Design a protein with these regions (language model features):
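Extracellular loop and loop/strand-boundary signature of outer-membrane beta-barrel proteins
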Residues: 1-3, 36-39, 77-82, 118-124
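Residues that define the transmembrane beta-barrel architecture of outer-membrane proteins
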Residues: 7-13, 42-48, 62, 84-90, ...
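Specific aromatic-rich, kink-prone transmembrane helix
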Residues: 93
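Histidine-centered active-site/metal-ligand motif
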Residues: 114
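Gram-negative (and chloroplast) outer-membrane scaffold detector with strong preference
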Residues: 11-78, 100, 137
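Outer-membrane beta-barrel "beta-signal"
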Residues: 98-100, 126-141
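Short conserved catalytic/interaction loops centered on acidic-Pro-aromatic/His motifs
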Residues: 81, 103-107
Length: 141
C-alpha cells in the first residue's frame, strides 16, 4: 500500500457454482475472466476454487451476505505491481442476494479483489481493485 502506481480498469466475468452446507453457509467456487483496458489491453483468467458466502437470513426473499474466496490466476498484464504471470487472488466483500419463489434472482456485491504473487517473487506489491459485481443467479433445489 502506498507503493503502487498503476491505474487498472477492467471488465470481469465470474461464473459461480455453489452448494449450501447449512441454512446460512454456502461453499462455492468461481471462474475469473478479466479483460483489462487500462493501462493497456490484456487478459487474465483463473479459478477461485474455494470460497464461502455467509447469508444472514434464510427466511426472506432477499438477504445480505459476506464473502471470502481464494484461488489462482494467470495474467498477461505487464505492470510493476505484478512481476509474475502466475499469481494468486483473494476476494472479500459484502453483497445482497434476491431469491424470488420461481425463476432467476440477482446478486450485487462490493468486493476487494487482490491479485499478487504471495511473496514468491519480487516485491509482491499486488493489485487491489474495489469492484462492484452484479449478476443473475439460479438456485437449484
Amino acid at each position: 500500500y502506498g507503493k503502487t502506481e498503476s491505474d487498472v480498469t477492467f471488465a470481469a466475468f465470474h461464473p459461480q457454482l455453489g452448494r449450501f452446507v447449512t441454512d446460512h453457509l454456502e461453499l462455492y467456487g468461481e471462474g475469473t475472466l478479466l479483460l483489462y483496458r487500462d493501462p493497456r489491453l490484456a487478459v487474465a483468467g483463473g479459478i477461485a476454487g474455494i470460497g464461502g458466502r455467509y447469508h444472514f437470513w434464510n427466511d426472506r426473499g432477499w438477504t445480505p451476505y459476506v464473502i471470502g474466496i481464494a484461488g489462482l490466476i494467470w495474467t498477461g498484464l505487464d505492470i510493476p505491481e505484478l512481476d509474475r504471470t502466475f499469481n494468486f487472488q483473494l476476494v472479500h466483500g459484502v453483497g445482497v442476494r434476491v431469491v424470488p419463489p420461481r425463476g432467476p434472482g440477482w446478486i450485487v456485491e462490493l468486493r476487494n479483489h487482490h491479485i499478487s504473487n504471495a511473496g514468491t517473487a519480487g516485491e509482491n506489491l499486488g493489485v487491489n481493485a474495489a469492484t462492484v459485481v452484479a449478476g443473475v443467479q439460479w438456485v437449484l433445489r
